[in-house]
Swiss-Prot record:
This is Thymidylate synthase. The keyword Transferase applies. DUMP binds at residues 22, 180-183, 191, 221-223. SUPFAM superfamilies: Thymidylate synthase/dCMP hydroxymethylase. It holds the Pfam family Thymidylat_synt. It comes from Haemophilus influenzae (strain PittEE). The lineage of its organism: Bacteria, Pseudomonadati, Pseudomonadota, Gammaproteobacteria, Pasteurellales. PROSITE patterns: THYMIDYLATE_SYNTHASE (PS00091).
Length: 283
């Protein structure tokens, strides 16, 4: 929680205004932010200075793990996070590759589970990583990436948190996640939950101990219509201690994550928070 608030204060005090063409808004911006999450000791990085809806964040990443490409599938898991980008993004609505209502195109999990080769075959990046880690193998290339410039025109949004690298040291698994751009008041709340949970899940299904998760952000920003709420409301609040995340121990394989797992298999214990803050979302 401390490192999150320090980043917010850094943006408010040191950030520079940058115009964002996609949204038509200005962003108070800093370059390079490093966050670290202690998964080994279950220090779940859930924002406490405003109420955080953690289930939607985990549901979204579960959708990525399953390779979903439709906002309706994400809604069925319990999150509406893709509704706007799939159905209200002007550029995507005009894109001839869009296949109708709720279609997201070849984004995020589609690339992770079915990266297309020139011959038309696909690569399941996640399956390869799980197989290797289960066998105790770290080839220094246990990398899951959603960033495929050759298919940006086939999706509604370029990935923000785009690459996840796993490192196995002995029987302890670590994760380094890379993010090109981060809406700190809204997006980071989700992203840090996802980084933590991804490592916890991967350690569980590969039979390894979870270590630390490292979260590297290039462009961290606060939109101009979010600044007042961040500066005058959220940063005035004192944080509560971090809660813990409980994951159903019956989740043992990638197939489990692909099939029967729901949000009922996750529980947060000891969560205290201040009142919600409704930050504007930029499509």
């Amino acid at each position: 929680m401390k490192q999150y608030l320090e980043l917010c204060r850094r943006i408010v005090s040191e950030g520079e205004w940058v115009a964002n063409e996609r949204t038509g808004k200005r962003c108070l911006t800093v370059i390079n932010a490093d966050l670290e999450y202690d998964v080994a000791n279950n220090q779940f990085p859930l924002i406490t200075t405003r109420k955080s809806y953690w289930k939607a964040a985990i549901a979204e990443f579960l959708g990525y793990i399953r390779g979903y490409d439709n906002a309706a599938d994400f809604r069925a898991l319990g999150t509406k996070t893709w509704d706007a980008n799939a159905n209200e993004n002007a550029a995507w609505l005009a894109n001839p590759h869009r296949r109708g209502v709720d279609d997201m195109g070849r984004v995020y999990g589609v690339q992770g589970r079915a990266w297309r080769k020139p011959n038309g075959e696909t690569i399941d990046q996640l399956r390869k990583i799980v197989n290797n880690l289960t066998k105790g193998i770290d080839d220094r290339g246990e990398i899951l990436t959603f960033f495929n410039p050759g298919e940006f025109d086939l999706g509604c949004l370029r990935p923000c948190m785009h690459t996840h690298t796993f490192s196995l040291v002995g029987d302890t698994l670590h994760l380094t996640s890379y993010q090109r751009s981060c809406d700190v008041p809204l997006g980071l709340n989700f992203n840090q939950i996802q980084v933590f949970t991804f490592l916890a899940l991967m350690a569980q299904i590969t039979g390894k101990k979870a270590g630390k998760a490292y979260h590297k952000i290039v462009n961290a920003h606060i939109y101009e219509d979010q600044l007042e709420l961040m500066r005058d409301v959220q940063l005035k609040r004192e944080p509560f201690p971090l809660p813990k995340l409980e994951i159903n121990p019956d989740i043992k394989t990638l197939e489990d994550l692909e099939t029967w797992v729901t949000m009922d298999d996750f529980k947060v214990v000891g969560y205290q928070s201040h009142e919600p803050i409704k930050y504007p979302f930029s499509v």
